[in-house]
Amino acid sequence: MGVSAVLLPLYLLSGVTSGLAVPASRNQSSCDTVDQGYQCFSETSHLWGQYAPFFSLANESVISPEVPAGCRVTFAQVLSRHGARYPTDSKGKKYSALIEEIQQNATTFDGKYAFLKTYNYSLGADDLTPFGEQELVNSGIKFYQRYESLTRNIVPFIRSSGSSRVIASGKKFIEGFQSTKLKDPRAQPGQSSPKIDVVISEASSSNNTLDPGTCTVFEDSELADTVEANFTATFVPSIRQRLENDLSGVTLTDTEVTYLMDMCSFDTISTSTVDTKLSPFCDLFTHDEWINYDYLQSLKKYYGHGAGNPLGPTQGVGYANELIARLTHSPVHDDTSSNHTLDSSPATFPLNSTLYADFSHDNGIISILFALGLYNGTKPLSTTTVENITQTDGFSSAWTVPFASRLYVEMMQCQAEQEPLVRVLVNDRVVPLHGCPVDALGRCTRDSFVRGLSFARSGGDWAECFA
């Protein structure tokens, strides 16, 4: 893929909390690309948890993400999060009210706080930002180029969860995919453009493997909220005290401090200068504070939708069983979150394709990653102390579900192997498979991979959803 060096926070590799300086302004051609994603201001922007833009982890992959010599990909599937969005409507109202309150009560706006005096909250709500749209265009380009032996001759089957921003993401992916295909002189002529073939409702009563919501006990769980509150209390009070001292007259809650930190990402990705200018909200906090913020987001995902929640991985079981069906060209066997009407029809769940793309949200993807056992090597995350990426065995919210994240599942036929091999990449990082005899390149044979997904094939702990 011709990747270049990636500047990542040093703490991710060593736990050290100081790093290299990042220039105040970067040219888009060097810091925001199809191959590498968003490398602008990486010492800060890669610490935004799930609010980080997609950035490639190819150079963080111990195993090369390139297709091994002597192998050809015979099946490829991408599961993508939607692109960068504006704050949700409910959060946006809270952000706006907080800024207005600061403007009304602060008696001084000195130095790095000066922008707050006249800052006008005018961000949209819920939908993709223009930057987020381009992320998905780039994703479609990259998917086409990576799997061009397939994409030149095959129209992918595409599904989307029912949210407008997820559907829009799928359409932008198609735009990038098809524009690249039309420029490829070796592409098979006369093929139709891809389209979103299935949109799955996100109504609370609907079965939706891309965005499950019918497991009552899980939906009522407050575990992640408790973990979030407890870890917030370990690092935010000192920030709050500093902000209140610097903004005389202002009184903040710990939650409001994290809102100001959220604004660093949202204000940056909502502007046309996303590649050359970092939001002034970002400078209100230190590098160490961003490390804690990033870890806080990882805790929320791990204890909300991952293995830290007793029913977290079970929410991804339906999708795992759909993947098994696609890999083996056999009917879906699942009684959890799958939609039997859709999955039993070749029109809405074909079993004979070799190229698939699905679009969803971060929470559902986290559950799917754990249902597939990709982070079985991750021990329960400490709820009191920041752990680096080595200690978490490669898990963090920024490394798994940034905006426009992508999970690639590949099946390949290799000259030295009789059986097809399966491997998985998360944001260009090869994640060695668990639960099956894995080779030096992180792969298992298809049949052993399927056997290893016994948790998914047995329905996980779905019976506990309604206890």
Curated annotation (Swiss-Prot):
Phytic acid is the major storage form of phosphorus in plant seeds and, thus, in seed-based animal feed. Phytases are therefore of considerable economic interest. Optimum pH is 2.0 to 2.5 and 5.0 to 5.5. The active site is at H82. Optimum temperature is 55 to 60 degrees Celsius. One of its GO terms (molecular function) is 3-phytase activity. PROSITE patterns: HIS_ACID_PHOSPHAT_1, HIS_ACID_PHOSPHAT_2. It is an enzyme of class 3 (hydrolase). It catalyses: 1D-myo-inositol hexakisphosphate + H2O = 1D-myo-inositol 1,2,4,5,6-pentakisphosphate + phosphate; 1D-myo-inositol 1,2,4,5,6-pentakisphosphate + H2O = 1D-myo-inositol 1,2,5,6-tetrakisphosphate + phosphate; 1D-myo-inositol 1,2,5,6-tetrakisphosphate + H2O = 1D-myo-inositol 1,2,6-trisphosphate + phosphate; 1D-myo-inositol 1,2,6-trisphosphate + H2O = 1D-myo-inositol 1,2-bisphosphate + phosphate. Induction: Expression is induced at low extracellular phosphate levels and the presence of phytate is not required to induce phyA expression. Glycans are attached at N105, N207, N339, N376. GO terms for cellular component: extracellular region. Its EC number is 3.1.3.-, 3.1.3.8. This is Phytase A. It comes from Aspergillus niger. The gene is phyA.
